[in-house]
Amino acid sequence: MPFSAKTEYGLVALMDLATAHATGDLVQTGEICRRHAIPERYLEQMLTALRKGGFLKSVRGPRGGFLLARPPEQIRIIDVESCLEGEVSPARKGERQDPEFQALSELGNRLEQARAAILSETTLAQLVQKRDQMKQLQPMFYI
C-alpha cells in the first residue's frame, strides 16, 4: 500500500522544511518545487492543507515562506497522511461471505493495522535521518 502522489509530495516538502527547521529559515514554495520537481500549483495546495492541519506556519511577503510549526520529532507520518488524504481506510464494498473471501479480508485488515502501526511510530525526523543515510550511500561523481 504505497503512498499517493499527494502524500509523497507532501512528505518530500516536509523533509525539505525539516532540514531548514534547525536554523529557523523560511523556505519558499518555488525552492521546494525546483529541488524536487514538484508542480508548483499542486504543492501550494498541499502546503495550504498542511498549514491548516497545524504542521506548518507561513509568512507572507516577498521574503516569506514556510517553516515547520513544531519539531520534526513531533510530526508523525500517519498524521500527515490523514491531513492530506482524510482518514485512510481500505475500501471493501459488498464483502462476500465465502470463507476464502473472509480469510482474504482478515489478511487485508491485518495489513492495514500493521501499516497504521508503522506510520504511527514513524516521525518526520526519522524519515529525514533515513534520507540522509541514503544520500551518504549515493556515489559521488567528480569531473
Where are the regions that the model predicts?
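N-terminal helix-turn-helix DNA-binding core of bacterial DNA-binding proteins
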Residues: F3-I38
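Alpha-helical residues within the helix-turn-helix
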Residues: R34, R51-K52
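Key DNA-contact positions within bacterial/archaeal DNA-binding proteins
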Residues: R41
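Short, hydrophobic-biased segments on the C-terminal half of alpha helices
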Residues: L47-T48
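Beta-hairpin "wing" of winged helix-turn-helix
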Residues: F55-P62, L67-L68
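Conserved segment of winged-helix/HTH DNA-binding domains
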Residues: P72-R96, R110-Q113
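C-terminal regulatory/oligomerization modules of transcriptional regulators
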Residues: R96-I143
